Amino acid sequence: KKSLHRLQTIRLKNENSVIGYLDIYHGWPKKNILWLGDIFLHSKVYGHNYGREIIYNLIKEIKKFEYKYMRCSVRLKNWPAIRFWARVGFSKVVGYLGDKDYGVNKFADLILEMDINARRKEEWME
């Protein structure tokens, strides 16, 4: 059986240098959902809209298949990541996981979802 998990390196087109990786699960937790396990970009490329471009191109690719949604989880204490995911269209909270009470060594994640057909191309440049 083909694995649902894929780890993809992210490279700059012109330089072919690795700037990060993308960790995805096809059809998890449901057949019509693509789960983004991780997206990591090197700090040297922050602020150049590579994250937005990666998500936009990923959506273009997965629209060719039967996916309707993408999901990811984000730590509640990670404000830059929450802002990023909201900006690229992960605006629906579909769940949460983690510790039940707050503390320094405690964690909690929001599970966010995007309807991949809800965003228009022109919205990506806002």
Can you say where each PLM-predicted feature lies in the sequence?
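Acetyl-CoA-dependent GNAT
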Residues: 1-46, 55-57, 61, 65, ...
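Active-site-proximal loop/turn and secondary-structure-junction residues that shape catalytic pockets
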Residues: 40, 76-78
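Short glycine-rich hinge loops at helix-strand junctions in the catalytic core
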Residues: 49, 66, 89
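Short glycine/proline-centered loop/turn elements that form peptide/ligand docking sites
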Residues: 51, 55, 78-81, 98-104
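Conserved catalytic-core motifs of GNAT/GCN5-like acyltransferases
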Residues: 73-75, 86-108
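Terminal substrate-recognition subdomain of acyl/acetyltransferases
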Residues: 87, 102-126
